[in-house]
A protein has these predicted regions:
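C-terminal structural segments of small proteins and small subunits
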Residues: 84-109
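Short, low-complexity, polybasic intrinsically disordered segments
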Residues: 109-121
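Short, well-structured hydrophobic secondary-structure segments
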Residues: 24, 28-41
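Short beta-strand elements
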Residues: 36-44, 94-99
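Short edge beta-strands and adjacent turn/loop segments
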Residues: 5-7, 16, 38-63
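Short, internal active-site loops enriched in acidic
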Residues: 11, 46-50, 102-106
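Short amphipathic alpha-helices in soluble, non-transmembrane regions
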Residues: 19-25, 77-82
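Mid-chain, well-packed structural core segment of small domains
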Residues: 52-90
Length: 121
């Protein structure tokens, strides 16, 4: 945690690498001072079928889920960083949006397996 989920129009895969989009989003989150880089998890999901108004055909929407407790100004700063960096690096994307969400710490549950380290002998 935090989780950064990038939704995008699959047509963008012909314009640039989605891995680059993930790196730009990660870097913006890392320098935001809202979270630690080691905690950031980024994933991307393409959409084949998209209906947008006004002739818009490409989009990137980023949802960042954080445990509750950040100030509104921190969340606004994070959203602006992500949006600005994506717009600067991927100017062909017609619609870029960011949503920062609070996760309920009582309801959020996680299971994490620790890697097994082999005996050095």
């Amino acid at each position: 945690m935090p989780h950064v989920v990038i939704e995008y129009a699959r047509a963008l895969e012909h314009e640039f690498s989605i891995a680059e989009v993930m790196e730009v989003a990660f870097a913006a989150c890392a320098r935001s001072s809202v979270m630690q880089p080691a905690d950031i998890k980024v994933r991307a999901m393409p959409f084949d079928h998209v209906r947008l108004e006004g002739g818009v055909t490409t989009f990137v929407h980023v949802t960042v889920s954080l445990l509750a407790g950040r100030a509104p100004a921190q969340k606004e700063h994070l959203a602006n960083l992500i949006r600005q960096d994506l717009a600067r690096n991927f100017p062909v994307v017609e619609s870029i949006s960011v949503d920062i969400r609070d996760m309920d710490p009582v309801a959020y549950k996680k299971r994490l397996l620790k890697p097994v380290l082999e005996d050095a002998h």
